[in-house]
Amino acid sequence: MESTYTILKKQITQRLADVPLHQPIHINRALSDVLDSYDIPEKAKLACLTIDTAMCHLDAVPGDHLSKQSILIGDLLSAHFYTILAELNNPSYQAKISQAIVEVNELKSSIHHNQIDKQQIEKTILTIECLFPIVTIQHYIADVNT
């Protein structure tokens, strides 16, 4: 069985085939391995890994020198996520992962604007890094301890 990492890497390569010379896309192999250790639908694993990849890619775009191409690639990755989400056709999961995206963006904004207490910064970063897989796994696995 092909890993979620390998499947997504192939899909991204196909999506970006017409984009000349772009920075490498980092896919979180460890997250893929965690997702692959659970019996959840492949498209749910791909959706989770894709939104993680898109968000990390956009986070890596330098703030002072926003590359139009880097932003375009982030947008293409986000569009790929929404395509997978539509194919999955699970409105309940769609609502949960969409709410997770909103929460992650709000937390990132709070950090950026120094609105998080120093005592809460570690917890906030852990939430940002782990929320997508937690939402995905908890949605599909009834008795999971995350």
Regions found by a protein language model. Give the residues of each.
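Mg2+-dependent prenyl diphosphate-binding active-site environment of isoprenoid biosynthetic enzymes
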Residues: T4-T146
